[in-house]
């Protein structure tokens, strides 16, 4: 077992609970009745990013749903990676097509089944955990910034204005897009 596998094995219960805590939030951007869920999901992401070791994690207003921004600056002269992801999900209907509740994660045949487990909470969660591993093991050589939006599933109507307004904050050498 290599060092990464050991880290995952040692932390698996907490890793799974943290991921499931995100998936359980029905952050459906297309439905206005989920406005509070959108904020709850953004706040949960900020908390998880802080726990992973970022210097700051902010839930920032936009013209629509909040945007989560976080960063870890290891060296002002180092290159910066900006990780983009989204925390909103599509509606789960029709519910009768689900074999389990869409916002109650279930493991079947080694896979997590739930709305958002893949697109995009699962993918972005893996990026954050990789960052955490690198940081905790003294392997992080680049600055890392995260931007997680809450409107990708409805066309990202607020993202362009947010990026324009905060272009200095979001400045990076490379962007890693975490989305299917």
Feature map (PLM): residue ranges:
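N-terminal helical capping/dimerization or prosegment-like subdomains
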Residues: 2-95
């Amino acid at each position: 077992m290599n060092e990464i596998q050991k880290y995952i094995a040692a932390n698996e219960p907490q890793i799974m609970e943290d991921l499931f805590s995100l998936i359980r939030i029905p952050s459906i951007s297309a439905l206005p009745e989920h406005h509070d869920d959108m904020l709850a999901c953004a706040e949960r992401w900020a908390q998880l990013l802080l726990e992973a070791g970022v210097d700051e994690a902010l839930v920032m207003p936009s013209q629509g749903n909040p945007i989560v921004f976080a960063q870890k600056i290891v060296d002002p002269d180092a290159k910066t990676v900006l990780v983009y992801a989204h925390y909103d999900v599509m509606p789960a209907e029709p519910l009768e097509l689900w074999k389990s509740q869409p916002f109650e994660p279930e493991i079947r045949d080694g896979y997590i089944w739930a709305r958002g487990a893949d697109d995009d909470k699962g993918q972005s969660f893996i990026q954050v955990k990789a960052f955490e591993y690198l940081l905790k093991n003294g392997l992080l050589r680049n600055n890392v910034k995260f931007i997680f939006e809450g409107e990708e599933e409805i066309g990202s109507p607020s993202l362009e204005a947010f990026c324009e307004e905060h272009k200095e904050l979001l400045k990076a050498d490379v962007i890693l897009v975490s989305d299917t």
